[in-house]
Amino acid sequence: MLQPKRTKYRKPHNVSYEGKAKGNSYVAFGEYGIMATNGAWIDARQIESARIAISKQLGKTGKMWIRIFPHMSKTKKPLEVRMGSGKGNPEFWVAVVKEGTVMFEVANIPEAQMKEALTRAGHKLGVTWKIVARQGAQ
């Protein structure tokens, strides 16, 4: 699963996923992509399962780009522990996805197969999404 090799701080402040994405908002590398239509934290496990779903459809000629990375750790306190006594330990890693962020891109496979791959991947993500084409691709 994806996670940073090293971070400056173990426990970051919570980053808001509300609002529109400033960058990463168009299909830059492939022909089609999945764009988030609302904001959310996407877990590293969700990214990995979406990657596997796309990989199974691609075959040998298809290419895939993952445009998000889980940079932020999320903390959790142990079960049955009273509130207080500081912040919990880092439990998992998330990517902050805002509305309009392109998360995955694919290329070099037929259009029907491409849309099937992106649809399967989209169902693995905890965010509403739509399939977008590259500008001038059609």
UniProtKB/Swiss-Prot annotation:
Q: Where is the signal peptide?
A: none
SUPFAM superfamilies, alphabetically? Answer: Ribosomal protein L16p/L10e
Q: Per its UniProt record, what CDD domains does this chain match? A: Ribosomal_L16_L10e
One Pfam family recorded for the sequence: Ribosomal_L16
Asked if the Swiss-Prot or TrEMBL record annotates the protein with the keyword GTP-binding, the reply is no
Kindly state which keywords UniProt assigns to this record, in alphabetical order: Ribonucleoprotein, Ribosomal protein, RNA-binding, rRNA-binding, tRNA-binding
Tell me, what is one Gene Ontology molecular-function annotation carried by this entry?
tRNA binding
InterPro entries found in the cross-reference section:
Ribosomal_uL16 (IPR047873), Ribosomal_uL16_bact-type (IPR000114), Ribosomal_uL16_CS (IPR020798), Ribosomal_uL16_dom (IPR016180), Ribosomal_uL16_sf (IPR036920)
Task: Please give an example of a GO cellular component term from this record.
Answer: cytosolic large ribosomal subunit
Q: Name one GO biological process term.
A: translation
Q: Does the entry feature the keyword Metal-binding, yes or no?
A: no
Which HAMAP family does this one have?
Ribosomal_uL16 (MF_01342)
Q: Give the protein family.
A: Belongs to the universal ribosomal protein uL16 family.
Quaternary structure, from the entry: Part of the 50S ribosomal subunit.
Its function, per the record, reads: Binds 23S rRNA and is also seen to make contacts with the A and possibly P site tRNAs.
Q: What is this protein called?
A: Large ribosomal subunit protein uL16
Species of provenance = Mycoplasmoides gallisepticum (strain R(low / passage 15 / clone 2)) (Mycoplasma gallisepticum)
